[in-house]
């Protein structure tokens, strides 16, 4: 959003009804995990980004928690308390998320003939995409994810 023109200046207050709102979607559920409102429920019921002006300043951030919650809840026709608890306690990283893409880029690095780096990448290749403390590569994956994504979480 360019800030060098008066186009972006507020001249009046936006009516409450004009703000993005998702009420009683057909899916029966909403997710709020500090994510953009375009990813709050099943894809068929989400708000459409193009329906809202970029001048509203709506953050576009999509967290792993939002991606995972939507991915896990979307196929459920009914959500039991046990299923909701499993979603809440999920330790996985969504394949569409930035963390998994970052790990994929790390795995593509040339180790430059360094056996220590080659060994670390072999271990990282075994990562199952979760941080449940069960996999041998969990700690390494956590350390790799933590630093570049520290400003998001």
Regions of interest found by a model, annotated:
Residues 1-153:
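Long, compositionally biased non-active-site segments enriched in small/hydrophobic residues and glycine
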């Amino acid at each position: 959003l360019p800030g060098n023109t008066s186009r972006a200046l507020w001249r009046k207050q936006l009516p409450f009804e004009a703000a993005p709102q998702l009420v009683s979607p057909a899916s029966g559920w909403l997710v709020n995990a500090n994510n953009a409102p375009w990813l709050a429920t099943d894809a068929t019921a989400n708000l459409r980004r193009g329906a809202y002006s970029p001048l509203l300043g709506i953050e576009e951030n999509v967290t792993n928690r939002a991606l995972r919650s939507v991915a896990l809840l979307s196929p459920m026709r009914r959500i039991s308390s046990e299923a909701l608890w499993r979603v809440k306690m999920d330790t996985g990283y969504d394949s569409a998320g930035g963390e998994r893409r970052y790990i994929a880029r790390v795995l593509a690095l040339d180790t430059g003939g360094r056996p220590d780096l080659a060994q670390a990448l072999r271990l990282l290749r075994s990562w199952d995409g979760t941080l449940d403390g069960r996999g041998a590569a969990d700690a390494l994956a956590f350390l790799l994810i933590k630093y570049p994504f520290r400003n998001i979480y």
